[in-house]
UniProtKB/Swiss-Prot annotation:
Species assigned in the record: Homo sapiens
Region Disordered: start-end pairs: 1-44
Protein name: DNA polymerase delta subunit 4
Induction: In response to DNA damage, genotoxic stress and replication stress, following UV irradiation, ionizing radiation, treatment with methyl methanesulfonate, hydroxyurea, or with aphidicolin, protein expression drops to undetectable levels, due to proteasomal degradation. This down-regulation is ATR-dependent.
Keyword Nucleus attributed: yes
Length: 107
């Protein structure tokens, strides 16, 4: 009986070259629960508004502005975050802040 064949007998071994710094892999993924920090205050405010858009406990957000949705949730006693109202009042004419995450999608 012959010797047991290995997979490397059929396929050549290919060694990969490492990158210029000696590392062949990229950055490690962030730890669970660790969220990337926003670049600046405006980006942090937009992220707060995106999270408000994704929170369904305040009702649907299609077809109305974020301020209208916030006021409707307040009237219904759903206690929307006051930080959202403050951000919306500081940027009254900016559609990036006033329109919801879904405003570009047709109904």
């Amino acid at each position: 009986m012959g010797r047991k064949r290995l997979i490397t007998d059929s396929y050549p071994v290919v060694k990969r070259r490492e990158g210029p710094a000696g590392h062949s892999k990229g950055e490690l993924a962030p730890e669970l629960g660790e969220e990337p920090q926003p670049r600046d205050e405006e980006e942090a405010e937009l992220e707060l508004l995106r999270q408000f858009d994704l929170a369904w406990q305040y009702g649907p957000c299609t077809g109305i502005t974020r301020l209208q949705r916030w006021c409707r949730a307040k009237q219904m006693g759903l206690e929307p975050p006051p930080e959202v109202w403050q951000v919306l009042k500081t940027h009254p004419g900016d559609p990036r802040f006033q329109c919801s995450l879904w405003h570009l999608y047709p109904l």
